Amino acid sequence: MENTGWMGKGHRMTPACPLLLSVILSLRLATAFDPAPSACSALASGVLYGAFSLQDLFPTIASGCSWTLENPDPTKYSLYLRFNRQEQVCAHFAPRLLPLDHYLVNFTCLRPSPEEAVAQAESEVGRPEEEEAEAAAGLELCSGSGPFTFLHFDKNFVQLCLSAEPSEAPRLLAPAALAFRFVEVLLINNNNSSQFTCGVLCRWSEECGRAAGRACGFAQPGCSCPGEAGAGSTTTTSPGPPAAHTLSNALVPGGPAPPAEADLHSGSSNDLFTTEMRYGEEPEEEPKVKTQWPRSADEPGLYMAQTGDPAAEEWSPWSVCSLTCGQGLQVRTRSCVSSPYGTLCSGPLRETRPCNNSATCPVHGVWEEWGSWSLCSRSCGRGSRSRMRTCVPPQHGGKACEGPELQTKLCSMAACPVEGQWLEWGPWGPCSTSCANGTQQRSRKCSVAGPAWATCTGALTDTRECSNLECPATDSKWGPWNAWSLCSKTCDTGWQRRFRMCQATGTQGYPCEGTGEEVKPCSEKRCPAFHEMCRDEYVMLMTWKKAAAGEIIYNKCPPNASGSASRRCLLSAQGVAYWGLPSFARCISHEYRYLYLSLREHLAKGQRMLAGEGMSQVVRSLQELLARRTYYSGDLLFSVDILRNVTDTFKRATYVPSADDVQRFFQVVSFMVDAENKEKWDDAQQVSPGSVHLLRVVEDFIHLVGDALKAFQSSLIVTDNLVISIQREPVSAVSSDITFPMRGRRGMKDWVRHSEDRLFLPKEVLSLSSPGKPATSGAAGSPGRGRGPGTVPPGPGHSHQRLLPADPDESSYFVIGAVLYRTLGLILPPPRPPLAVTSRVMTVTVRPPTQPPAEPLITVELSYIINGTTDPHCASWDYSRADASSGDWDTENCQTLETQAAHTRCQCQHLSTFAVLAQPPKDLTLELAGSPSVPLVIGCAVSCMALLTLLAIYAAFWRFIKSERSIILLNFCLSILASNILILVGQSRVLSKGVCTMTAAFLHFFFLSSFCWVLTEAWQSYLAVIGRMRTRLVRKRFLCLGWGLPALVVAVSVGFTRTKGYGTSSYCWLSLEGGLLYAFVGPAAVIVLVNMLIGIIVFNKLMARDGISDKSKKQRAGSERCPWASLLLPCSACGAVPSPLLSSASARNAMASLWSSCVVLPLLALTWMSAVLAMTDRRSVLFQALFAVFNSAQGFVITAVHCFLRREVQDVVKCQMGVCRADESEDSPDSCKNGQLQILSDFEKDVDLACQTVLFKEVNTCNPSTITGTLSRLSLDEDEEPKSCLVGPEGSLSFSPLPGNILVPMAASPGLGEPPPPQEANPVYMCGEGGLRQLDLTWLRPTEPGSEGDYMVLPRRTLSLQPGGGGGGGEDAPRARPEGTPRRAAKTVAHTEGYPSFLSVDHSGLGLGPAYGSLQNPYGMTFQPPPPTPSARQVPEPGERSRTMPRTVPGSTMKMGSLERKKLRYSDLDFEKVMHTRKRHSELYHELNQKFHTFDRYRSQSTAKREKRWSVSSGGAAERSVCTDKPSPGERPSLSQHRRHQSWSTFKSMTLGSLPPKPRERLTLHRAAAWEPTEPPDGDFQTEV
């Protein structure tokens, strides 16, 4: 059990009741039961002061029980105990104290029996004195006679034992004895006693004096009790360092001494205790005491002083000089431990002083920075520039500077001016003196004949001497010259002037001889030209004034920072001045300055715990500031200083940072060394080598964390830019070799897992230095607690050299730290040119320092971050060099073993920071971001040109090739074009963080959209194959799939990641870490799989019987079909496509889409995969070349498949060129006229289909669909399959709902005059150019009521041409017959001509010809068509125009296209919208029956065996219904009129009824082998109409 308390709160366990306690004690004593240690022992820690009784200390009050008190730090604290004598406790339990170095849980305190004592005495014969002393370490508390016994310990643990025999203990103690507080404990700081501890000691001394009759003294430093000035008082002095290395454990007062002599002495005033002490014996008067002194926190091998400010710890000894030669620095620190009863600490916690070593360091010669380029040597024409640098001379045998001192280069200025001519000299001026000799001057002017800026060669003025009268003698003299004035010009030869005064005045003339003024030229350098001056500029809220090239201008920092910014005016190679980048190395943001002030406030706190918690808050705030990524280069240097103070404070306060604090600390370092800060670090290097200081801070913090670890414990910290491994191993038993990094650890970053960097540290390297040999590194000494006998305290002459122990203690540990930096090589000071850091940087640090092996054993493998380098060298960082800013890489410590394409292996001798130095390629810069590479530009440009060509062709012929497939293709091309443009934009190095993030997000969107549009094309082909009509809703779904699905994926990814991972410092694409890349790879893979599935389904559909137009393939496939399915109805010109069968155009388009997906989709996947690799790894030329090849091939393939190989585009181009097919009629939807492609719109196709469709209806067969069902499928559900053709039970026919390839097997008809069976007589609707007509067979059978599905929806005004003869409309026309009313068997002419809107039968011709099949009459009867009459074509109805244009009519109207003529033909059609209600269907059905025209008059032919072409045509379709046989000229009109009134039975007898029921004599209609119907119209017919 462990108990912690404050101010007396120790472990306390009160028994439930005295009766229960007595029962337990009696049982244990009766059976001689030894109590279990877990139930009889207690451990207390953290007790500063307390007074305890038996029931407070022991869980179970019994003999053998123990109570152990822990000293938190024996080097700094001491335990003071006062034992208050109580007779019952002493008599029954004989308490004694045992000072222990280690706590033993199962240790028993029972006194050994006499037999065991004898055996123990025999075993102790021959034991050394140390073991005897340890055996006699127990102190009997009741051996003295006084009321108090004082004890002083500096051990780790003090154990209080009840050591009496069980038989001697009573069954029950008195309650007063149980509650008597017989032990008082006080924990005192040896060097900083608080007021409370001194007050307790003073009270003890006062009580001791009252009991003894005289004063008692305590030799405790820093404590003084009031009233101690008497003679008997003990003065308090500070003890010096111990004179001996090993002292005894404790001091107790002598047994026989009187109570008045019970004084407590400190460890420094006692002699060695060498006599043996056994149980029951009195201790000697001079017992021995073992004292341990506190050590320095920074230097564990040195002892700390014990004098100084009582409110703070003493200063530690000065550390070893930081340099082995020359002038270095020494540091000493102190920490403050304050209790609530003490005062706060004041003053600094760290001091630094310079130190000079006797050894002189060799100083190599160092070049200073190059000076600025001089102005051109000539003001015009071609000259030269030069610049110089100065070499700091070497000292003490250092190397001289290498390299040139002067550099020159050519310069070209403006053309030199034309030399002018001097004019005549002017007159001489006056003499300069009035007496004696003087000078005269004259001048001349330059005549400029050329440009205004031409000059003349020669002097402008001329001077000569002049003689005057002698000056009179005077006694005056000149005074001293004053200082020269400022130059009148800063350049281009100005002048300076100085004066002197005449000190005396003569009687006549000028008082002094000579002149009192002197003038001399100055600033002879040429003034910079206009192009050599930097203009005024306003950048970042700062105004930079104009300056000449080479000058540095200083300015205030931006408003959000304090300090000064600088900027240099530079000169380009062409001689033009320009401003360099501003330097903000001396600018510090307000937030960072406030954070530093809060750091100072935490440092001012005296208590360690508060200071440690304050540092945790500082690290948390610093992480939040750096995460914003808005800071200056000066903020980075300031952050390094903050981290150094945090590390020192953690170390001084002995505060163990938590795991979160450690993670935040290294996360801050990761933010600072990020590659985005390379330019900031380059700027900061001009002021201070902050990256080198950061490297040292990281190493110190690693060892701070490692000291808090347990033995064999390790810690791994992983961030975006560095990986840290920390482990603690005992010095005497290092477990195994060290390998770093462990790539298989959980949480490891991808850049570490895939890297080839490796460290191998054999355990032979981990050995301490030999005795007396100085340490070889600046690491701290061994963290052992005690000083071994082989160590010697530092003397005055060896204060800066630390000696390691010869035999390390078992408690000494190695702290091994390894760090792999991802980007540190970019920010460390670079080596001398032409070398550069071409690998990652790895740091290895071990403390205490190890002995360097005789040969290199440390193996390091470092992978390259720059490809194409040459001459690699392994190097280590050398801290001993004086100037760290010039580059401290040392290549002599490591050997380069092996160089491969991906990494280099090194072997080094010393532990340090390692890297590979090599010469980078000449055409490679170390910039992580730059302009796009040439392969990327070529690939994107070729692909964009191909796609733009495709878009231009489609835009030119859009009205001819507009379709769903074309729209999908255009969206697909736009997504690829946008992707190529964004790839090029993302490679630019001028993008900001926000623009790069947006570029990555849009790239993600367009990459996914390109895949989705390929999937949309597959979906469209699938819908075309299954024959489902695409409504506008389906088209909107196309857009949702193509653009909506990628937008949803990108929105979800951005929302979850908060744009983290969209764009990195190296590229503008999805980050390869964190799993964000799966947001693109996952959907793309799913789309590819779904596309493959749809492709397989479409292919199976096309290979089925309805999807193959080739008859041979169908026969091989063994599919059965209706025998009449290969025939075509006479209305093939309508362009209708049968709904249950797939048209050849749809099959062709579906096959083209399938083939396009199979070719484009794999190429698209390869292109974007290579694009991702090329963007993420710019150094790889292979990936960029692959992307260029795949991207170019993708553009060409898309253009070829969808443009050059597409049939629609080919037809458009042919028709534009005038190459048209001659076998197509004028009215064909795909025919060409006058070089133009005549393509019907969806509306005109619907009208053409409605007017030229033939519908066969039968009672007991399939339910035929309406035109509404044919066009828009409104009457059928979308998922309902169309009905197939069937054969009736008696051989009757059943057809598909709409026109198709139908073969009509004609059954045998009854004889003439016999009525046919009603079930075999079906109403026949024939179509012409003007509309539909019904061959009325109602006189053979009554018409049955038709269902709502047995009708066709036709326009209200189907025909507007009226017959030329009588029988017009008007009131005499019969009304429409109600549905279901039977008609009479015969009809008169009046009945036939009673419909005003239809043509009578005399305007139609019925013929049999080769076009629609042949018919042989076995009875020798012929059928003569009626002669043409000028009824419909020549006599139009008043107010209505003709529907057709004869081909023989000349004029400009013939030049109209077929499209215009069809629009004219259907211009006055008024279609009603189809409704989904039964009422509207019924009305349309009745209207349809009213407008059908009935055929009742036909003429007979006299010729028996003549082949006839028969057709039913309206007057408006004469060009396609011309009979092959013309009537004889002599035929009488009466005969024609008679034949016109012939009944239908006669016609049936001569034609259909006369054929025998043999297959070879069946009526054969025109086959569809040469007919290719157009595609079914897309869209909703009801909505479009």
UniProtKB/Swiss-Prot annotation:
Detected in cerebrospinal fluid (at protein level). Strongly expressed in brain. Also detected in heart, thymus, skeletal muscle, and different cell lines. Disulfide bonds join C321-C355, C325-C361, C336-C345, C376-C411, C380-C416, C391-C401, C431-C466, C435-C471, C446-C456, C487-C522, C491-C527, C502-C512, C534-C569, C557-C587, C874-C906, C894-C908. Residues 1372-1382 have a biased composition (Basic and acidic residues). It is a multi-pass membrane protein. The keyword Secreted applies. Coiled coil: none annotated. Keywords: Cell membrane, Disulfide bond, G-protein coupled receptor, Glycoprotein, Membrane, Phosphoprotein, Proteoglycan, Receptor, Repeat, Secreted, Signal, Transducer, Transmembrane, Transmembrane helix. The modification Phosphotyrosine is found at Y1351. Gene3D superfamilies: 1.25.40.610, 2.60.220.50, GPCR, family 2, extracellular hormone receptor domain, Rhodopsin 7-helix transmembrane proteins, Thrombospondin type-1 (TSP1) repeat. One of its GO terms (biological process) is G protein-coupled receptor signaling pathway. Receptor activity is regulated by proteolytic processing. The long N-terminal has a an inhibitory effect on the constitutive signaling activity. Removal of the N-terminal region induces an increase of the receptor activity. Glycans are attached at N106, N191, N192, S266, N356, N437, N560, N645, N867. Residues 229-271, 767-806, 1359-1385, 1423-1454, 1498-1585 are annotated as: Disordered. Residues 229-238, 769-780 have a biased composition (Low complexity). Residues 1575-1585 have a biased composition (Acidic residues). GO terms for cellular component: extracellular region; glutamatergic synapse; membrane; plasma membrane. Residues 1543-1552 have a biased composition (Polar residues). The chain crosses the membrane at residues 937-957, 966-986, 995-1015, 1037-1057, 1079-1099, 1122-1142, 1154-1174. This is Adhesion G protein-coupled receptor B2. It comes from Homo sapiens (Human). The lineage of its organism: Eukaryota, Metazoa, Chordata, Craniata, Vertebrata.
